[in-house]
Structures are given as C-alpha cells and as structure tokens.
Amino acid sequence: KMTIEEFSAYAEIYWQKSIRPDLLNGIYQPTALKRAIIEKDDGSERLLAIPTVCDRLIMKAIAQVLSPLFEPEFSDYSFGFRPNRSQKMAVKHVQDCIATKRHTAVDVDLSKFFDRVDHDYLMTKLGRKIKDKGLLELIGKYLRAGIMDNAGQYFESRIGVPQGSPLSPLLSNIVLDEL
C-alpha cells in the first residue's frame, strides 16, 4: 500500500529504472486491483476495484491520450462520465427539449453494466481506432489484471471494466456510444 506522496519518491527511483522500460518493451504487468465496497444510498453495495497509485497514473495517462481520439465521435446527447459535461447539462438539455416540444428523453441505468462489459467486444472497438498494438495489449492487461479482496484472495477478470479505474469511464462510453 502506497500513498501518492510516497509514490513520488518511489517513482524517482523506479520510473527510469523499470516502469518506463517495461512499458516501452511491452512487459509491464499491472498489479491486481484492490476490492473496496461502498454502500449506496438505497442500502445496497457497490463493488469498486482500486488500482495502485502507479497503475492509476498510467491508466490516467492512457485515458488522456485516448480521450481526444474517441470523444469527438460520441453523441452530443450523452452526458455520463464525459469531460466538460455534467448532470446539470443533461437536465438543461431535457428542459430545452420540453420547451421546444421534443418530448422524447431516455434515462438509462444499465444494471451492473461495468461488471458485464465483454473484453473481446471492447478490444475490437478499441482496435478500430488505436493502431499501437503495444497500447492495446496494455489496455488488455489492465482489463485482465484481476482483483484482490481484503482477505488476500485473487479473482480473475474475464469480463467487465473495473469501477474505480480512471480508464473505465472512457472505456464504458466507447461501448455505450452505439446506444
């Protein structure tokens, strides 16, 4: 377990020595994500999968690189997990539709969506735009990194995108955009 502050000192030593070369050579192996459980407003539980600080930073960098590639093609009517968009903007859009007599609106809450994303389908969609095979392989490794629960038991990840990953909102929108 490492804090962001502790990671700074760690990165000074290991970034040039091992992390960067491993990333560039395609041999970097993400760490299993840590299981966290949060209680939702309705009393049910949401399972999160929290990456290490190092993996979180790498995933955030991947998201920053991929976002300009995919964002321009997303529907103007999609507001969830999007940069420069908010729930208030979605509400305003619905109000504008009502005011202009366009009365059709859809509020979609897909049950356990993050847990059910098909990796092959997602990777195929990513492969249509991303030509860097090393980047595609790294994203695949993150999807399959697995989850470690609080008792130290490891669970494979064969399906789904982890809630708690900085890359998951973008990946989920890539899958959902066709809706």
Where in the sequence are the language-model features?
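Short, conserved beta-strand segments within well-ordered enzyme catalytic domains
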Residues: 1, 37-39, 47-51
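Non-catalytic, polymerase-adjacent accessory regions of viral genome-replication enzymes
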Residues: 1-13
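Secondary-structure junction/capping motif
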Residues: 3, 49, 86-89
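Short, Φ-rich (hydrophobic/aromatic) sequence segments
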Residues: 15-23, 58-66, 139
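Conserved polymerase palm-domain catalytic core
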Residues: 18, 22-26, 30-32, 36, ...
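A short catalytic or substrate-binding loop motif that flags glycine-/basic-rich loops and adjacent residues
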Residues: 29-30, 40-42, 54
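Short, internal active-site loops enriched in acidic
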Residues: 43-44, 113
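Conserved pre-motif C helix in the palm subdomain of viral-like polymerases
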Residues: 45-74, 158-179
